[in-house]
C-alpha cells in the first residue's frame, strides 16, 4: 500500500529531492525493515517519532468508549490517511530527538520498563534484562495494547502514554479535519430496484454456475444466517488440496490452509471485537506527509462487506464517478480467452482511473448461458496490481459484486487481493429464497442478512 501513496507523496522537508526517496520500501525488505523505512519517512518529513508510531501502529481506538474525543479524532484522521500495521511487535526506536518504546494494538509481545532514581529508563521484553539495584528503581510496569512510553531527549522529559496521546492530538485540528467524514447512511437512497434480485430457476442456474451446492447452503450459509458465525465441524477436513484435486475448485480454495503455518498466538473471539476493525474508506487523503493537503470528502464504512441494497446505495452516492466493468467472457471459448478477458478488465480499469470514473465496480452479473464469470479473485487482483504499478491505485476504489462468495474465506481473499468492498449478491439471493421457504423459522429476513 505504501507504493500507492508514493505518487501523491510530497513534503517541503525534502525539497527537490522527493523522488530520490522512492520506493520508500525496497523490494524484498523484511517486515521490520519495511516498518523502519516508513517510520523514517514520516520522521524526516517533520513528524515527531511518537506521532509516526501512532500513525503507523495505532492502538485499538474504535471500541474504546473512554477515549477522549480529541484523541479519537486524531486516530480517525490517521486511519483515513494510512493503512495500519498490525504486528505483533514490541517496538523500540530513536531518531536522536526521541527515544520511544511501544506495542501494537494486540500486545501479544511483552514490553516491561523500569525507571531508576537517577533518570535511567530501561525497556525490554522482560524485567531483569539489565541488572538494577531494587533500591534504585522508583517505578516499574509494563505497557498495554497500543501504549507508548517515550523520552524527549531535547527537553529531558519522560512522557507516558496518556501524555503522549494528548500531546499528539493537539498537533493538528483533527476534530475539524474529520468533521466532513461521511458514512453509508449519509448517502442518498438508491433508485427502486437498483440492485437486481434473482429467484427461481434463474437463481438455481446461477448457483450451479458458481459451484454452490445444496450441501453448501445447508452447512455454510444456514449456519451463518442463523447464528452469525462460521460453521464449526468436529470430524476434520479431508478434502484434497485444490492444487491436487481432480474436481473443479474455486480460486479461493487455492489460498486455503489446513494448518497454522504462522505460529503467532491466535486471537479469541472476545479479544477480536476489541482490537480488530473491518472499517474501510473511500477518497484516500491526498498526501500522507502533510495535514493541510487533504481531501475532506471521505466516506468511511464499518465493513467492506455490503448487502445488495448498500451496493446500490454506494453506486447512487458516487453518481457519475462510477465505472462498471463486466467480468465475464464468452462461454465455450479457448483457454487463452481468460487471459484476454483479464487484460481487457485491466485496460478498462486504467482508462477509468485516468478519467472521471474513479470508483470502479467489477461485476459478474452478466453470467448466463452464453457468458461465464471471470474468477473474481483474479479480476480484482489484476486491477489492484495493475493500478498500483501505474501509480493510480490511490485515486480509485475497487468494488466487487461476485457470485463466488459464500464463506468468510472467499470474502477475506477478495479483500486481501485489493478489493475495497465486496457484495456477495448471489449468496444473499439464496438466503432470501431460503427464508421465503421458512427455513429460518421466526427470524426476520433483515436479521438473517445481518447475521450473514
State what each model feature region is.
Residues 1-20, 33, 62-90, 96-101, ...:
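Glycine-rich phosphate/ribose-binding loops and adjacent secondary-structure elements
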Residues 2-293, 307:
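Conserved short alpha-helical segments that host acidic/polar catalytic motifs at enzyme active sites
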Amino acid at each position: 500500500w505504501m507504493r500507492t501513496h508514493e505518487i501523491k507523496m510530497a513534503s517541503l522537508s525534502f525539497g527537490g529531492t522527493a523522488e530520490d526517496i522512492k520506493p520508500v520500501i525496497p523490494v524484498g525488505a523484511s517486515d521490520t525493515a519495511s516498518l523502519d523505512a516508513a517510520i523514517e519517512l514520516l520522521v524526516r518529513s517533520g513528524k515527531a517519532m511518537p506521532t509516526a508510531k501512532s500513525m503507523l501502529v495505532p492502538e485499538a481506538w474504535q471500541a474504546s468508549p473512554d477515549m477522549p474525543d480529541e484523541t479519537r479524532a486524531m486516530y480517525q484522521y490517521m486511519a483515513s490517511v494510512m493503512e495500519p500495521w498490525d504486528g505483533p511487535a514490541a517496538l523500540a526506536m530513536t531518531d536522536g530527538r526521541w527515544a520511544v518504546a511501544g506495542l501494537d494494538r494486540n500486545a501479544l509481545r511483552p514490553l516491561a520498563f523500569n525507571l531508576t532514581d537517577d533518570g535511567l529508563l530501561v525497556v525490554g521484553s522482560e524485567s531483569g534484562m539489565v541488572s538494577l539495584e531494587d533500591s534504585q528503581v522508583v517505578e516499574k510496569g509494563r505497557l498495554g495494547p497500543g501504549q507508548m512510553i517515550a523520552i524527549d531527549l531535547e527537553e529531558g522529559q519522560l512522557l507516558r502514554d496518556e501524555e503522549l496521546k494528548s500531546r499528539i492530538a493537539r498537533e493538528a485540528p483533527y476534530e475539524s479535519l474529520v468533521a466532513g467524514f461521511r458514512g453509508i447512511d449519509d448517502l442518498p437512497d438508491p433508485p427502486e430496484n437498483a440492485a437486481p434480485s434473482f429467484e427461481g430457476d434463474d437463481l438455481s442456474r446461477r448457483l450451479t454456475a458458481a459451484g454452490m451446492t445444496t450441501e453448501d447452503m445447508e452447512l455454510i450459509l444456514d449456519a451463518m444466517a442463523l447464528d452469525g458465525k462460521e460453521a464449526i465441524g468436529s470430524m476434520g477436513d479431508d478434502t484434497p488440496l485444490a492444487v491436487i484435486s481432480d474436481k473443479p475448485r474455486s480460486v479461493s480454495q487455492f489460498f486455503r490452509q489446513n494448518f497454522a503455518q504462522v505460529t503467532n498466538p491466535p486471537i479469541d473471539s472476545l479479544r477480536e471485537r476489541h482490537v480488530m476493525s473491518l472499517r474501510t474508506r473511500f477518497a484516500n487523503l491526498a498526501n500522507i506527509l502533510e495535514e493541510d493537503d487533504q481531501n475532506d470528502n471521505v466516506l468511511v464504512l464499518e465493513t467492506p462487506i455490503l448487502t445488495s441494497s448498500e451496493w446500490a446505495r454506494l453506486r447512487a452516492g458516487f453518481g457519475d464517478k462510477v465505472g462498471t466493468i463486466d467480468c465475464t467472457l464468452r462461454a465455450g471459448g479457448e483457454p487463452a480467452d481468460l487471459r484476454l478477458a483479464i487484460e481487457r478488465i485491466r485496460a478498462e480499469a486504467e482508462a477509468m482511473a485516468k478519467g472521471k470514473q474513479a470508483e470502479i465496480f467489477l461485476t459478474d452479473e452478466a453470467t448466463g448461458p452464453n457468458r461465464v464469470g471471470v474468477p473474481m479473485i483474479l479480476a480484482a487482483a489484476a486491477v489492484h496490481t495493475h493500478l498500483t504499478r501505474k501509480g493510480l491505485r490511490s485515486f480509485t476504489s475497487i468494488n466487487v459484486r461476485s457470485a463466488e462468495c459464500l464463506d468468510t474465506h472467499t470474502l477475506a481473499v477478495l479483500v486481501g487481493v485489493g478489493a475495497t468492498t465486496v457484495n456477495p449478491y448471489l449468496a444473499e439471493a439464496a438466503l432470501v429464497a431460503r427464508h421465503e421457504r421458512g427455513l429460518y423459522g421466526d427470524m426476520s429476513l433483515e436479521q438473517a442478512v445481518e447475521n450473514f
